[in-house]
Amino acid sequence: MRMKKTVAVIGAGNVGEHVASLILLKNLANVKMFDLPRKTEEKVFEPVKGKALDMKQMLAAMDIDARVEGYTVTPEGEGYEPLEGSDIVVITAGFPRRPGMSREDLLEANIRIISVIADRIKRYAPDAIVIVVTNPVDVMTYVAYKLLNFPKNRVMGMAGVLDSARFKTFISEELMVSPKDIHAYVIGGHGDEMVPLISISNVGGIPLKDLLPKEKLEKIIERTRFGGGEIVNLMGTSAYYAPAAAIVDMIEALVQNSKRILPCSVYLDGEAGEYYGVQGFCVGVPVKLGSNGVEEIIKVPMIEEEREMWRRSVESVKKTVEVAEGILSAGSSRQ
């Protein structure tokens, strides 16, 4: 019987805690959660330990034989020693964008967080596969890749799996068919410039463009692009059920060595980079996921209209990467 893998989840907020609970409910792996304390004037709370205890009792109630622990850490990086032995590390920790905060402010704040976490992963889990969720995800995946100095197959970002799930949801609602029978990919940067690949999307083998008129497809694409914002406007907070499920989809492929083809943000260079017109940064493309991480980058065909959308998406990510490079350089020169 093979040893159960261990997944570390850094950041046990809405997304992180749902990732942990889904992993446990599917009995995919043991889980370690890491998060900051919550301080009030009267008391210092350790919510991550409380969540882990709650999940232990959930497992007992459901007769699931898995382990979960919660560890309180500091912003400076103390308390990460239990990362040791983790096979997969998921980074969900990060600041959301707040009113009055520029994109550069957000970048700088989250680069600081990723820098501390990357250092601790290198120290305690040097053989782990790392999944980055912190936004802006393509840029933070690149930052993590550069700071970790891991082989590129072991660092990836979650974006396209979620965007593709949203795309499939809206197609499913429009056509009144099961999402299981819809094959559709969204690639590119995780943002307004994402690229839904209509030309290769199909429902039960029938091309999507033969089932929906262009104007309806355009509305679905627009809704997909702003799918996260739609949820924020309804709930007053970011989505977490679907992002968590998308992350667990990736984890399942890694743990079970299932060779799934999933769109992930990965570092592109060489032959694959030449095909996609990207050299030296991370952006979302279909990849084969297995026990070694990213085992192959799939070269997906695109029609000219999609190629143009792809170029715009890549350019948008590249500009933000350049800003991040400046922040990283400034940070290293201060040390």
Swiss-Prot record:
Gene name as annotated: mdh1
Entry function: Catalyzes the reversible oxidation of malate to oxaloacetate.
GO biological process: carboxylic acid metabolic process; tricarboxylic acid cycle
Record-linked Pfam families: Ldh_1_C (PF02866), Ldh_1_N (PF00056)
Cross-referenced InterPro entries: L-lactate/malate_DH, Lactate/malate_DH_C, Lactate/malate_DH_N, Lactate_DH/Glyco_Ohase_4_C, Malate_DH_type3, NAD(P)-bd_dom_sf
E.C. number(s) listed in UniProt: 1.1.1.37
Residues binding substrate, per UniProt: R97, R103, N135, R166
Catalysis: reaction(s): (S)-malate + NAD(+) = oxaloacetate + NADH + H(+)
HAMAP family per record: Malate_dehydrog_3
Record keywords: NAD, Oxidoreductase, Tricarboxylic acid cycle
Oxidoreductase as UniProt keyword: yes
Protein family: Belongs to the LDH/MDH superfamily. MDH type 3 family.
Binding-site residues for NAD(+), renumbered to this chain: G11, A12, G13, N14, V15, G16, D35, N110, V133, T134, N135
Organism taxonomic ancestry: Bacteria, Pseudomonadati, Aquificota, Aquificia, Aquificales
GO CC, one annotated term: cytoplasm
GO molecular function terms listed in the Swiss-Prot or TrEMBL record: L-malate dehydrogenase (NAD+) activity
Protein name in the entry: Malate dehydrogenase 1
Active-site feature positions: H190 (proton acceptor)
